[in-house]
Amino acid sequence: MQTAPPSRSGSAARPAPASPRETVEHLEAALAKCSATEAGAGENPWRSLFYEHLRDEGLPALVKNDAVTPAGSLWTGARLWTKSFREFSLQAGDRIVLALPPSTAFVQVLVAALWEGLTIALVPPNDNIGGACAALDARGAVALKPGPFRWTADPYAGPASVPDVLRPTEGSRTPDVRFLVRTSGTTQRARWIALSDRNVLSVLASHLPHLTLQRARVLSVLPWSHVFGLVLDLLPALLAGAEIIRDPAGGRDPASLTALGEAWKATHLSAVPRTIQRLLATERGPALLRRLHGGIVGGAPVAGPLADRLAETHLRAGYGQTEAAPGIALGAPGEWAAHYMGRPLGCQVAVGANGELSFEGPNACVGVWRRHEGLDRRSPNRTVRTGDLVRREGADLFFEGRTDTAFKLSNGRFVRAGAWEGRLKRQFPSLHDVLLFAPAGDDVSVALCTDPSGPNSPSETAIREVLGPLAERLVGCVRIAPTDWVRRGKGTVDREEMTRRLRASQSAN
């Protein structure tokens, strides 16, 4: 099911994938098969795409641990999965959990499930698979280890084992939902978002023309169980006929990631800011980033110091949410500034009087899945509030904060922390981050994430000038090095843990 590795020099003859124009035309034709309501699903839009781009082709190809699987073998393995799904009488809209790591088997199961019109719930491989099946009322799962209602996967050739029976379900099928994807939970409690064919294909059609993926070698680090990795990393690379070089460590080991990118002469990389910061901290990582032809940095705001480094590359800003499948905005290659989000793409956006960004368009999710309740459907033509505070300069969007970071002081005063933090970061772009918190409930303190050896950080007097009327409640201004700033996996601040540590430190002092 595999071939020898393609020439890493790029000089050997490589099978020619479809041209970018042809790929976009195929996507637009697939999108035209999707209705806005998704009711009474008709022709499956994925079948023609995969038939054109995988069957009997050499590219795309997936490379992991130096094993190369060309498109034709991806197709053959997917047909084995299709056969198994049909033997178990799975029908369009039956829900299955896909809980494999990024791999050849993951792609084969994904293609087969899309071909059959199943509803695919994407779950990290080490999650509670049985719990996910119960929460999502799924018929079964494809997982690493055997268990009730589970398939396991051969690395390259279809199922390794099949379930004895499928799980009985309580609710109805969901043929108009193609993916159930969990939000990251970094800004609010994680939710299962329902995405339709139209949602995903509209983002692919709007974004792929900008990604310059023809004859690309994509260094893949993002989890494919998250919508950023699925829709803006894996699927574009597959449809564009790219070589997908999968990092087994998922970007967590910058030295091995750099070596992998150098060995395969990678041309593209999409990642969260924290992965980029790790690469920049290595000896050869900066050179690798400068050699790349393209890629998206998204998932978390990019502070001024990192934006300055990214301006030396061809990487671009990307912004979105799981609820937007996930495309809302995209920047140009090498166009960076502190907290830059890009320009709206594939949807319409508006900024409310309070600075909150909202969007509407074909990317707006079709609902939210609730345990014991099923699918809470949403109108596809609605306006979706993001909870993100932004400022708009012409067509460009800049991140200012979150609406859900507000808190009340003990005297009842309402502090919109996200808005104030945005003002401070805009006024002092050398700051990596800012956190407003209430040390004891009566007043506010400001924590500044700043380089100890970098430019002079703003004085407390300068901070007070920006805070205006809130300055009368300011009782402290603490400076913290980036290495001590507590972050989540994508690079966003862990507000709860950071506030706890700051309060404990101030109490001890």
Task: Give, region by region, the residue ranges found by the protein language model.
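Conserved ATP/PPi-binding loop(s) of AMP-dependent carboxylate-activating enzymes
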Residues: 343-344, 352-382, 396-398, 402, ...
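Conserved pre-ATP/AMP-binding loop-to-beta segment of ANL
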Residues: 41-44, 162-182, 188-189, 211-218
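Conserved AMP-binding A3 loop
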Residues: 70-72, 178-205
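Conserved C-terminal "lid"/linker of ANL adenylate-forming enzymes
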Residues: 407, 435-438, 464-509
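Conserved AMP-binding/adenylation subdomain of ANL enzymes
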Residues: 201-217, 225-268, 273-278, 282
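Gly/Ser/Thr-rich phosphate-binding loop
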Residues: 266-271, 277-336, 349-350
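AMP-binding/adenylate-forming catalytic core of the ANL superfamily
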Residues: 361, 387-473
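Conserved AMP-binding/adenylate-forming core of the ANL superfamily
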Residues: 41-42, 58-90, 97, 101-103, ...
